[in-house]
């Protein structure tokens, strides 16, 4: 036996909240992912709705999605996500919220809509508020 002291880790493992991000604008997607990661979230970033829908078999704490994207739009992704994960927090960030939601597509109950342009700090604050609720 070595003469090394026994070290006990009394901290509890706490998983970072997981965010599924769907945004077709490359630069905005990268900025959002970095800002949310710096704020302590685990982020999986997808370039379109189809890519995001393919990730829905995993557990997520929040879906943050653009509405107008190639493939499945954000509302369709949100509906699929809400059906698979009841209680999932959903937030839309879009420049076309009024147009997209007025076209007869209703967002899942409890979803929040943020309009572009929006400052990264404001998005992080809104995500923090939604995660705390």
Regions found by a protein language model. Name each.
Residues 45-62:
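Acidic, metal-coordinating helix/loop segments flanking the phosphotransfer/catalytic sites
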Residues 48, 73-77:
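Acidic catalytic/metal-coordinating carboxylates
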Residues 118-128:
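C-terminal output helix
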Residues 69-70:
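Receiver (REC) domain active-site loop signature in two-component systems and cognate sites
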Residues 23:
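Conserved acidic carboxylate
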Residues 30-38:
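Charged docking surfaces used in two-component/phosphorelay signaling
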Residues 66:
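Active-site residues of response regulator receiver
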């Amino acid at each position: 036996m070595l003469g090394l002291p026994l070290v006990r880790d009394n901290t509890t493992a706490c998983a970072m909240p997981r965010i599924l991000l769907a945004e077709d604008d490359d630069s905005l997607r990268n900025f959002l992912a970095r800002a949310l990661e710096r704020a302590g979230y685990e982020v999986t970033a997808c370039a379109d709705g189809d890519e995001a829908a393919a990730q829905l078999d995993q557990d997520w704490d929040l879906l943050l999605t653009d509405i107008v994207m190639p493939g499945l739009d954000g509302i369709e992704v949100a509906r699929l996500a809400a059906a698979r994960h009841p209680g999932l927090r959903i937030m839309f960030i879009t420049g076309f919220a009024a147009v997209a939601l007025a076209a007869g597509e209703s967002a899942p109950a409890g979803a929040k809509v943020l309009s572009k342009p929006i400052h990264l700090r404001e998005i992080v604050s809104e995500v923090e508020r939604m995660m705390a609720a």
